[in-house]
């Protein structure tokens, strides 16, 4: 029996964007692994969050541009930009729900047991703590802040000409 595989068949491919979310699911699974040290687990939640930020700023923004431009071509996995956005919306929501649950219901109680507390707001600080945080931010953080994303306008590149 001679069966040939049609490598153009979308069934053989995973959508690039959805595979990114699956990767983040695997990263987040490390945060749920009780055999991993607590602060490492917290780091995996942070990595997932950072990855999702970049994913939405770059990949989802690109798909939205395609939809806006009425680009209808399907990717190698057979999905249009609109279909990808719909699937991303569903899967990213599920991922963020698991991420939030992992952080707030699993890791935060364990962190508190270790004497590590996260404050919800500036209002949780007493006056002395608030002054310290404000001063620290202005002296150490603010001076090195740089934009992580810029728009495509010429304002940012006009000085280069």
Across the structure, where does each feature detected by a protein language model lie?
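Extended, charge-enriched "interface" segments that sit outside catalytic cores
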Residues: 32-35, 45-121, 126
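Secondary-structure capping and boundary motifs in well-ordered enzyme cores
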Residues: 16-20, 40, 48, 77-84, ...
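Active-site phosphate-binding and catalytic loops of NTP-dependent enzymes
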Residues: 33, 146-154
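N-terminal-proximal low-complexity accessory segments that begin disordered
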Residues: 9-52
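Extended, charged alpha-helical coiled-coil/arm scaffolds that mediate oligomerization and mechanical coupling
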Residues: 116-139, 143, 147-148
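Short, residue-level hotspots on alpha-helical faces of the histone-fold
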Residues: 26, 46-50, 54, 58, ...
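N- or domain-start disorder-to-order transition segments that initiate the globular core
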Residues: 2-8
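Residue-level detector of conserved catalytic or cofactor/ligand-binding positions
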Residues: 153-161
């Amino acid at each position: 029996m001679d069966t040939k595989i049609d490598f153009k068949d979308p069934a053989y491919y995973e959508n690039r964007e959805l595979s990114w979310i699956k990767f983040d699911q695997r990263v987040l699974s490390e945060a749920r692994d009780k055999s991993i040290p607590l602060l490492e687990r917290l780091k995996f939640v942070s990595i997932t969050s950072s990855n999702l930020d970049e994913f939405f700023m770059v990949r989802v923004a690109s798909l939205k541009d395609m939809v806006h431009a009425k680009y209808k071509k399907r990717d190698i996995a057979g999905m249009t930009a609109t279909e990808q956005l719909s699937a991303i919306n569903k899967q990213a929501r599920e991922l963020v729900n698991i991420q939030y649950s992992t952080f707030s219901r699993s890791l935060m109680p364990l962190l508190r047991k270790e004497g590590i507390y996260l404050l919800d707001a500036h209002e949780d600080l007493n006056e002395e703590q608030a002054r310290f945080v404000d001063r620290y931010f202005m002296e150490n953080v603010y001076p090195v802040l740089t934009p992580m994303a810029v728009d495509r306008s010429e304002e940012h590149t006009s000085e280069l000409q």
